[in-house]
Amino acid sequence: YLAAKAKERVTGFNIGDVIDLLDKAIEKCGTNMNAEAAAYVLERINWRLRLAQYTEAIADYDLYYTLIGGQVLPNFFFLREQAKFRAGDLEGALKDIQAAIQGSPSTPDYYAEEASIYVRQQKYEDALKSIERAIAIAPDFGACYRLRGVCCVRLKKKTEAFEAFNKAKELGDPLAGKLIKEHCK
């Protein structure tokens, strides 16, 4: 592990070499994997995500979950959801973000993330429900208004889409103006 940390400090280091060293640190823990091994697994997850190795990162998230006996915070499920989403596992991502919501129902970002999964699944009515929950918690969440507008466009509700995009723009969303020009003219 210390060799991996030292390797990170070398200019122009190879991330693959760091992952290999972390693999060895985890292997050294053998069958007695514990909190120490869990820390190494978390480190390896971060590097795998940097290399867009989402499937491997998901496997490491699962290993980490097992190593610590499932004692995780809601943010764990959010982070694993992000990897699953990027890997194209939308059902797995949805289950994880819903676990995050269950653990922290007052976090608007989790509802927004749930909505974005529903949009990818073309479940626009479900997405709108999630968006409404996020906005109820954080009324100035501009990205949610943008997402509401996208759902309304897909549902052929042009007036509602314009209103949502306009609210997003008013709240400073950087993409809202472009979406208004693209979908509401």
Kindly label every feature range from the protein language model.
Residues 159-185:
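Terminal, low-structured helical/coil segments at or just beyond the last alpha-helical repeat
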Residues 5-7, 46, 82, 116, ...:
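Residue-level recognition of tetratricopeptide repeat
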Residues 25, 64, 99-100, 133-134, ...:
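Canonical positions in the second alpha-helix
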Residues 33-34, 38, 72-75, 108-109, ...:
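Helix-start (N-cap) detector for alpha-helical repeat units in TPR-like alpha-solenoids
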Residues 28, 32, 67-69, 103, ...:
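Structural marker of alpha-solenoid helical repeat scaffolds
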Residues 9-11, 50, 86, 120, ...:
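Register position in tetratricopeptide repeats
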